[in-house]
Amino acid sequence: MYAIGAYGLWALLPLLFVFIEAGPIEILAIRVVFSVFFCLLLMQLVGRWSHLREAVASRETVGWLSLASLLMGTNWLCFIFATTTGRVLEASLAYFINPLMTVLLSVLVLRERLRILQWVAIGIGAAAVVVMTVAYGTLPLLSLLMATSFAIYGLVKRRLGRSTARPLGAIPGLTLETLFLLVPALIAVVLLWARGDLVTGSTGWLLPTLLAGTGVLTAVPLIFFAAAASRIPLSWVGMFQYIAPIGQFIIGWGVLGEPMPASRWLGFAIVWVAVLVFIGDVALRRRERQRQLDVEPRLPGTTQNWTDVSATQTSRPTPPLPKAASARHNAEVGGWQERAVGRPNGRGGRTPKVAVWL
């Protein structure tokens, strides 16, 4: 339910931006301001200020966070521009091809090896881009820019996780990223006001209320996403991510009435085939891992298998995980919980427990 809530709220964002009668720069600037406000409020509730102090004390971490905030701001601006100029379908296309772009970047940057179905999905996605380019006479630059910026943002966040001594967490991370964007956002607001182009505050209470809602819809889905990631397998979270572009497609085509000529239908259909191949690869990979867990190989030259050894080792009492000495300590270190992993081996062995970051 948390994953559905997160991606469902992200899917509804175009409806909010459509009703805001302001330019993309103003919407982005006000969204950053309200996002900072709500993130600081959440930080006060969860009490993880020590995470922020540790992050800003490291030059490397600050550098990666600055790059992440720049990419996030670019993605936000492109999305707002798309939704306020009648191009919601292009935004939807961007998030359909984003997983494929992420996989492609993992090959180019991280030198990872892809499975056959992943290459097939990327090839089909590239064919969709070619079809749309031929049909419209130009590359779908907005969709590609959104997908690429978000994919690079994911790589930067992955690198950022390796540069910190402990996980930064979703809320502290977003707080710092929006804080880095706060000064440019305030400068943009002042310049718009000086030129007489600032709409916020000049048309009554409705527009500021809607703009405040952008801050809520920035922070709340992130909380839901973090809750989902700590409760369900990551592969399931990856499946749920398509709720957002599907919802945006329905809003763009069915609610806002954006045109869908045959060439665009063909391009989207090819992208959907690529997505299905990608999902199929994830499902097959998950099944292979499950099959490997079910296999009980025997030790070489003996009749004893690995789970017998596991039973012997895990039957001994293990020391409990450290408990928080106080509520303040618990708030600072975040939520560590014991969670069972693997399966009971059926031979008297205990299922091991690990500490999971929530």
Language model region names:
Residues 15-23, 52, 84-87, 130, ...:
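Membrane-interface helix termini and inter-helical loops of multi-pass transporters
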Residues 32, 134, 139, 242-330, ...:
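C-terminal-most transmembrane helix of multi-pass membrane proteins
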Residues 81, 98-120, 246-265:
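C-terminal transmembrane-helix exit sites in multi-pass transporters
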